[in-house]
Amino acid sequence: MRKNMADYRIGILPGDGTGREVAIEAQRILNTIEQHTNQGFEQTVIPCGGQHYVETGHEWAEGSFDFCREEADALYLGAIGHPGAFLPNGDLAGGSVILGLRSGLDLYANLRPIKLYEGVPHKVHGKFTQIWEPGMVDMTILRENTEGLYHSLLRRSADRAMGRTPYEPPEMTFPGLQGEIAYDPRPISEHGSERLIRMGFEIAETRNGAPIDGKKRVSCIDKSNVTRGCQLFRRTFEKVSQNYPGTELDYGFIDAFTQWLTRSPESYDVVVTSNMFGDIATDLGAVLQGGMGMAASGNIGDKNAFFEPVHGSAPKYAGMNKVNPIASINSIQLMMDWLGRKNNDEQLIQIGSLIDESVADHLREGKGLTYDLGGTATCSGIGESIASRLSTKLQERF
């Protein structure tokens, strides 16, 4: 029996291009859960993004940020980016949505699971083949989400979203440099590092360890041999780690890590790193799991969170019903797990696991694959297939 009132209020921000199409598949999963459990979701759709800016002169409607901050229990975002859509200062139109939420809601942890499902090939040299082995790629990378090299842009975006005067970093001089100079400060704080790293250790407690040996391991990836910010990050890692004596510690410099990530992914369990390093490394990690169409993410703070596929809006494919919706569907899986743990709702945690199982079952057959995985299946077709499998599992479980 369904409850009369929705248990959770979910903000749906479809965004631009193919983001709108994969958002439909995310909503399909939410609707499937509602149909077969006593969980209810009040879904509020908020038009936003670059195209919305071109059409209306606004990145999203007034009051949207306040709704996301004060009323929504969780948020889903499709993708942001429309050809030629920029603000007068040159920033991406729609940045107040994705970046403004990250900074304005203090979503300090970007959660990127990197998991290879059975049946997923890798595209190398224009051919689809099996490079990495399922079961040997299963890690979570936590990227600091509010500081570092992107701090100024994040702050400006949050200021616009909250109606404040946009922040600009102070002017600086750089001895020895000539001509035009552009720069972005890279501030890293002990507070920001500590809360991210602590979350990494807490997540490691819930996992099964690294594939190669089953050991719970947290890897600190930085450039502490060069930068002061990374030296602070590593000192903070060592401080926080003292509270988790049962977890193995690992260290690496970001340049070497990119090699180890591709050659020995089975050695990694949980990775913590700074903002820009994590931005680059997680997209490289997406190659191991089959590409950006497989890469889901969560942007998580102490009170709020939003979940999104990490791929772009792919405007050239908009309206063609061909992009991969699995990153979008797995973003809902992450949402269910986060809501469940935040609200002590064990059923939601189980539902998240069933979404993961439904995706795995679909991919294991190796038939319903979109173009990015070497197939011809449609976006909606895959969404329907996974929702159907989930429906069966929910009926059997609940």
Feature-to-residue mapping (PLM):
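Glycine-rich phosphate/diphosphate-binding loop of Rossmann-like nucleotide-binding domains
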Residues: 11-35, 162-252
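N-terminal beta-loop-helix "entrance" segment that forms/cooperates
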Residues: 36-63
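N-terminal glycine-rich phosphate/adenylate-binding segment common to multiple enzyme folds
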Residues: 53-172, 182-183, 276
